[in-house]
Amino acid sequence: MTEQTPAVSEERGYRKALRGIVVSDKMDKTIVVEVQDRKKHSLYGKVMKTSKRVKAHDEENTAGVGDRVRIAETRPLSASKRWRLVEVVERAK
């Protein structure tokens, strides 16, 4: 008799992906990306622009200041890095 063990599938959970503009690349293998979002005020309904700056891991130092990039959420890589560079969408002019 053969036992059939269920296949163990370790699927990753949902990971966020953002687009933003590189504002700093002075660190080694790290870029700072500014991500903009629009949020509606809960009481008054006005649409406001919000922005946040996140540090992302850039393994090959490919992104430069002004580049439009896509980043994805990942495990903590350092005290402040929780994002990684997926691709450079558009180079700075």
UniProtKB/Swiss-Prot annotation:
Example GO molecular function term? structural constituent of ribosome
The gene from which this protein is expressed is rpsQ
Matches recorded under PROSITE patterns: RIBOSOMAL_S17 (PS00056)
* Classification of source organism: Bacteria, Bacillati, Actinomycetota, Actinomycetes, Micrococcales
Name the PANTHER family on file.
Answer: 40S RIBOSOMAL PROTEIN S11 FAMILY MEMBER, SMALL RIBOSOMAL SUBUNIT PROTEIN US17M
Question: Which GO biological process categories is it annotated with?
Answer: translation
Entry-linked InterPro entries: NA-bd_OB-fold, Ribosomal_uS17, Ribosomal_uS17_bact/chlr, Ribosomal_uS17_CS
- Family assignment? Belongs to the universal ribosomal protein uS17 family.
Name of the featured protein? Small ribosomal subunit protein uS17
Q: Which GO terms describe its cellular component?
A: cytosolic small ribosomal subunit
The protein's assembly and partners:
Part of the 30S ribosomal subunit.
What is known about what this protein does?
Answer: One of the primary rRNA binding proteins, it binds specifically to the 5'-end of 16S ribosomal RNA.
Q: Which domain of life is it from?
A: Bacteria
Q: Which keywords, in A-to-Z order, does the entry hold?
A: Ribonucleoprotein, Ribosomal protein, RNA-binding, rRNA-binding
